[in-house]
């Protein structure tokens, strides 16, 4: 190992949401004097307003700290802050590939949760040295010994050296830094070998093009050097290099073991994919990093501007968002009910919420979003296989030989007293139990196969409510399985509304259709004529509700007298309503599309 690397330590922090990861990062920055008290704002590394508000980290960040250890030597510590949510699992695995060690933060009041575990297993897969930290010991309900035991039982790590700390109060921070220096191995790698670096994040800067966050493993990268991206063979010239300490500053070179920023005139963020390998164009490395994959969206929904005039603005906003988020996809689509808009693809539910919230918040757009749907695999009668992300595109029933839907393997961690309620919820969602094991006396891990379509709506919210907020969920895609699925159309006055179509399991179709019609009846405003709301599978109507018409009393001015006069007036009114119904069209309000989302409740 090169002597010059022996002072470098690359590490990340793993934690479940809300276990105090970003606060701990703030304290490390303060303790090492990287940021002054005045500059330190809470959650320094979560730059997006949304990240701070939701208390989650969405994009990976890095920061370089200088630290003088108790042995008198100066160390360079690179903290690679990773997203903790399961939607961003691939980004996490790439960020981990860039480290040699990880701090495992466990909340002293909550214990080990599902996403902590999922991320720990990833860290172990990458052979990282794990430093356990038990955080929030200042809280009255903290149970340090219990959690220490849990780390040993559930994860199988030796926790006798686990550092008890409180990031909020600044307790134990010095001890954590010492552990990083002494336990995390220094990076290996030869600065003179051919260049080999991994991209673990990229974003778009309007002045400099795409900025890549990289970790150099072999060789050295310098300005004016020609580099090549492995996955697409494109070549670029390096313009500038930098590190965050914690604000960007330029450097002359990045050597093996270092983490930094490379700007190389890349114009399209899709060229700099997370997990890709960078090498020298003239003297390339032999092998790229293993494990690179193009992330595929799992959940889709339509996004339409409420004002048709905002279409261009929405397109620009989506373009800018996708510059920073290579996992997010979008393509134009039209809907008879909603006009022009886009079909967007996301990694998961949280990702979807974040994208929609950013569109509304950062670009001030008023949007209608359709119900999320997943990618179905359709085999038609001629044997051709097609993937469909929009229920409206499903071929007619008689042409479908089989329909397959994506399944997830879900790992749920919960308290033992909530097991019954959780099992019931999973059964309702067509889940198949795979495993149930008790971790100690208080916690349990439940493994289920559940169709993604059942998780997409509000599984997570329901899980939180049946477990009073204690259960945590982690999932991975298992593959496609055949299912008895049908397309449920909603007709309003006999006209199908494409944006309200959903694909459901046949057993559920009747119930779902009835619920939907009832919901829609409440939100569609009364007209001067009756409005029929029907749910149909193919040509068969399975549920109907009617929105009653406004009715003027045409007999008000008749007193007594002949019945035929009254009958004439009523007939005339009926005739008029019939004519209106033929030409009238029903305005469908925004709430109607939300009703589809809420039907599950």
Curated annotation (Swiss-Prot):
It holds the Pfam family EFG_C. Belongs to the TRAFAC class translation factor GTPase superfamily. Classic translation factor GTPase family. LepA subfamily. GO terms for cellular component: plasma membrane. One of its GO terms (molecular function) is ribosome binding. Required for accurate and efficient protein synthesis under certain stress conditions. May act as a fidelity factor of the translation reaction, by catalyzing a one-codon backward translocation of tRNAs on improperly translocated ribosomes. Back-translocation proceeds from a post-translocation (POST) complex to a pre-translocation (PRE) complex, thus giving elongation factor G a second chance to translocate the tRNAs correctly. Binds to ribosomes in a GTP-dependent manner. GO terms for biological process: positive regulation of translation. InterPro entries: EF-4, EFG_III/V, EFG_V-like, EFTu-like_2, G_TR_CS, LepA_C_sf, LepA_CTD, LepA_IV. It catalyses: GTP + H2O = GDP + phosphate + H(+). GTP binds at residues 18-23, 135-138. This is Elongation factor 4. Its EC number is 3.6.5.n1. Residues 6-188 form the tr-type G domain. HAMAP family: LepA. Keywords: Cell inner membrane, Cell membrane, GTP-binding, Hydrolase, Membrane, Nucleotide-binding, Protein biosynthesis. It is a peripheral membrane protein. Transmembrane segments: none annotated. It is found in: Cell inner membrane. It comes from the Bacteria.
